[in-house]
Amino acid sequence: MKKAFITGVNGQDGSYLAEYLISLGYEVHGMVRRNSMSENQDARVIHLSDKLVTHYGDLLDSSSLNKILENVMPDEIYNIAGQSHVRVSFDIPEFTVKTNSLGVLNILESYRRICPNAKFYQASSSEMFGNSVDSDGFQRESTPMHPVSPYGCSKLFAYSIVRNYRNAYNLHASNGILFNHESPRRGSNFVTNKVVKTAVQIKLGLTDKLELGNMDSYRDWGHSKDYVRAMHLILQQDLPNDFVVSTRETHSVREMTEYVFQKLNMDYNYYVTQNPIFIRPEELKYLKGDSSKIRKLGWEPKYTFESMLDEMIEHWISYYKK
């Protein structure tokens, strides 16, 4: 039985990845950070409690990483932990860089010394591209990277150090350059779930307005369930590599908001206002990924933009009607 170790296992991607690997017959171990509200931490993985082995640890605590890897000796490592909110990275840049950059270096060092024959996946991000776009309107593996946020900068260091360790130490270490991906498990401070959750609240009379930032930024949105399948596929290859994971479609925040409100038979114009607090100091205007490289391995998304949002709408309606 293969053993997998997932950092950030109680996050959106980590929880879906754990489910997927368990369904494939893996022995799955996950790392969680101890905090004062453990019940909130475990909400996404509580249903896996009899199948998932959790370990307390932190990417900034090398001793915890060493101890976990020595105990587990995994075949596959998925590093999905980190500070994942782009707007928040402007408020806490030091923590963002420590966690997303130094934290990756820490786990790479532990991996290199303790279980170098394992395969390693790093969660990279389309935010690394910044506003760089190829002439055909896509970002791909070869597109120059010029991030426009502390988050994007932190992920670019992590991406680069993974490539460096791969070449310097002959490690099977790969990057998945994931474009935006959502689900009902997405944090409510991210724009997609914020829009869906608040729209449902408005429909049910629980609130009367939705405040957003830049509604004319475009993103390539997919579903987390599809993207964790891509993570696993990347580590099944004989040689390590870097892959863009995306839907190859782009939609604006305005389009997304309009779709959600229309599904609930409402006109968003009556409820949505712009609040400058949600606008980034430097905006990333447009993302659209060319995922041709990983599609040649047989991956493709099962969810459409619309079916993803429909699932999120249904989730929040059910949540508030309980």
Language model region names:
Residues 131-134, 184-187, 293:
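Short beta-loop-alpha junction of Rossmann-like oxidoreductase domains
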Residues 17-19, 23-24, 30-31, 57-60, ...:
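C-terminal substrate-binding subdomain of Rossmann-fold SDR/epimerase-dehydratase oxidoreductases
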Residues 40, 185, 313-314:
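Short Asp/Glu-rich motifs
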Residues 1-181, 303, 318:
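N-terminal Rossmann-like NAD(P)+-binding domain of SDR-like oxidoreductases, especially those catalyzing
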Residues 121, 137, 174, 188-189, ...:
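Residues that recognize and position ribonucleotide moieties
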Residues 180, 184-187, 216-220:
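Heptad-repeat alpha-helical coiled-coil signaling segments
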Residues 37, 187, 191, 252:
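Short acidic-hydrophobic sequence patches enriched in Asp/Glu that either
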Residues 138-139, 159, 187, 221, ...:
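Tryptophan-centric aromatic hotspots in well-structured domains and transmembrane helices
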